[in-house]
UniProtKB/Swiss-Prot annotation:
Catalytic function, reaction form: tRNA(Glu) + L-glutamate + ATP = L-glutamyl-tRNA(Glu) + AMP + diphosphate
Primary residence: cytoplasm
Enzyme type, top EC level: ligase
Organism: Clostridium perfringens (strain SM101 / Type A)
Protein name, as recorded: Glutamate--tRNA ligase
Alphabetized GO MF terms: ATP binding; glutamate-tRNA ligase activity; tRNA binding; zinc ion binding
Any single Gene Ontology cellular-component annotation: cytosol
Length: 552
């Protein structure tokens, strides 16, 4: 009865057993092959792109299998908790199209039959399992002080031994329950450690769903499972929570791979089946000619807020991350340009085993493709939602001309090679400013981008001539014929072959004349279709722009 007495002394108010909790949280009634996965952040800061990356993998694997994706908050380190971090997590994942089937729904709310989903509210559950281990002699109170532990560590390092509390160095491992009871009753501080059954001669071999077979020496450490403050360590809480919440697969960063022997051993000691594990590669970026880990401190793109501020549509970020998760996604997208990305099946065994390279240039390419396929009404809604928060002037201007802006967002969208003007919403202002006199009139002659073959005075001569010939009420072919007539009158070639054969006979090409008109109306050399721009602006605005150009 000594172990029983020790367990009751440490946890006098814990009357539930592991069997009670196994019955309370039964196996989930899901179809065969359905996976149960979780996103389990600590509320110690705001979300970063690595969290979205990990969450996306978990969400896709769960939902594409007809399973469950839940949110658990691992808040045992409450000293580091940041106010608002939980709501930020929920909002971020929702904005990226990932909603949780169960778990935490707000700072003080949750849903699901496996509650509570906050570790800080599960203390009695952990204590029930620790009490059971104490009863069975599989765990023990350790009274080593921090000074003793530090001295032990220094001694072990000096002797080139593995530092830690194990074997002969586990001072209180074999302490009798009676002696432990005396020390506790005397008021000594302690933690609770699990007795490791590890053998230094053996290795643990496991299957990682990304890396394949992995092998490590068995864990020898008597790891702490309950800290001095009575809360569990991450290792122990993880094992209990994933067991009771019936998690089938744990997808986490490869920095946790070295902890796998500890976690597998815990499941063994607890007498329960371990979930399957996959350790995803760290997100890297190029720094000169070498790769390094994406840094919260150095790289603004590591923060999720960066993508909101710049105006990347959430779908663009998701599609780019799917490219990182499975390189085959790019080929699938090319073959299925209009399919929903949810139709793509993520496969862990096809994921890169080395660091996932994050490339903003590639993200921009993906985002241009995503925006290009959007209906103008969708572009308008997404852009104005962004501008309302990040560019109030543009929000006021664009919403004051909603119908016109939907036409603008549809320019050159419906042909076989649609334009890809925007990768993110903060680029829109520069690409459409000329539709608004309030912005256009701030420009000076120095801002005008003329064709390289033209000086400003020659461009003005072109506009003087074209203004007289300009007819708003024509179709595109007639409009271009009129433009060519003006070009011929002014000495510009309309036939490229003739121009190349005798360039000295011409001032330039008809494209230079069109370039002058484009510059007068937009001040830019590269814009969407000029005829369409003029039709959207309207005759009065076009003629007014010609006057302004001639006055430069």
């Amino acid at each position: 009865m000594s172990y029983e007495n020790l367990a009751n002394l440490i946890f006098p108010n814990i009357d539930k057993t592991p069997e009670y909790y196994f019955e309370k949280y039964p196996k989930r009634d899901l179809k065969e092959g359905a996976k149960v996965l979780r996103y389990a952040p600590s509320p110690t800061g705001f979300q970063h792109i690595g969290g979205v990356f990990a969450s996306l993998i978990n969400e896709r694997l769960a939902h594409q299998s007809g399973g469950i994706f839940y949110l658990r908050i691992e808040d045992t380190d409450q000293k580091r908790e940041v106010e608002g971090a939980i709501d930020d997590t929920i909002k971020t994942m929702h904005n990226f199209g990932m909603d949780f089937d169960e778990g935490i729904t707000g700072e003080n709310s949750e849903k699901g039959a496996y509650a509570p989903y906050k570790q800080s509210q599960r203390a009695d559950i952990y204590r029930a399992f620790v009490k059971d281990l104490l009863r069975k002699g599989l765990a023990y109170p350790c009274f080593m002080t921090s000074e003793e532990l530090e001295a032990l560590r220094e001694k072990q390092i000096a002797e080139k031994l593995t530092p830690g509390c194990y074997g002969e160095f586990a001072k209180y491992r074999d302490l009798s329950p009676e002696e432990a009871i005396k020390r506790i009753e005397a008021g000594e501080n302690y933690v609770i450690r699990m007795k490791s059954p590890g053998n230094p001669e053996k290795r643990v071999v496991a299957h990682d769903m990304i890396k394949g077979e992995v092998s490590f020496p068995e864990n020898l450490q008597d790891v702490v499972i309950i800290k001095g403050d009575g809360l569990p360590t991450y290792h122990f809480a993880h094992a209990i929570d994933d067991t009771l919440m019936r998690t089938t697969h744990v997808i986490r960063g490869e920095e946790w791979l070295s902890s796998l022997p500890i976690h597998l051993q815990m499941f063994e000691v607890l007498g329960v089946e371990a979930p399957k594990y996959a350790h995803i590669p760290t997100i890297m970026k190029m720094d000169g000619s070498s790769k390094r880990k994406l840094s919260k401190r150095k790289d603004p793109e590591s923060a999720v807020s960066y993508y909101s501020e710049k105006g990347y549509p959430s779908q663009s970020v998701i599609e780019y991350l799917l490219n990182i998760i499975n390189s085959a996604f790019e080929e699938w997208r090319a073959e299925n340009p209009d399919a929903d990305y949810h139709d793509y099946k993520v496969e862990l065994d096809k994921m890169s085993k080395s660091g996932a390279l994050f490339d903003l240039v590639k993200l921009n390419d993906v985002s241009k493709d995503v925006i290009c396929k959007m209906k103008p009404e969708v572009v308008y809604d997404l852009y104005t939602n962004w501008a309302k928060e990040y560019d109030k002037e543009m929000y006021d201007l664009v919403t004051s001309k909603e119908a016109m802006m939907k036409e603008v967002f549809n320019i050159d969208k419906e042909g076989p090679k649609p334009r890809k003007d925007f990768a993110k919403w903060d680029e829109v202002r520069e690409k459409i400013f000329y539709f608004f006199d309030e912005l256009f009139d701030k420009e000076t002659a120095n801002d005008v981008e003329l064709p390289k073959t033209l000086e400003l005075e020659e461009a003005k001569r072109i506009i003087e001539a074209y203004e007289k010939a300009y007819n708003f009420n024509t179709d595109k072919d007639t409009w271009f014929s009129d433009l060519k007539e003006v070009a011929v009158e002014l000495g510009y070639a309309t036939d490229r072959k003739k121009y190349k054969k005798n360039p000295e006979e011409y001032k330039g090409m008809v494209s230079d004349v069109a370039g002058a008109v484009r510059a007068a109306l937009t001040h830019r050399a590269n814009t969407p279709d000029l005829y369409t721009i003029m039709q959207i602006m309207g005759e009065e605005a076009v003629r007014e722009r010609f006057k302004k150009f001639l006055a430069l």
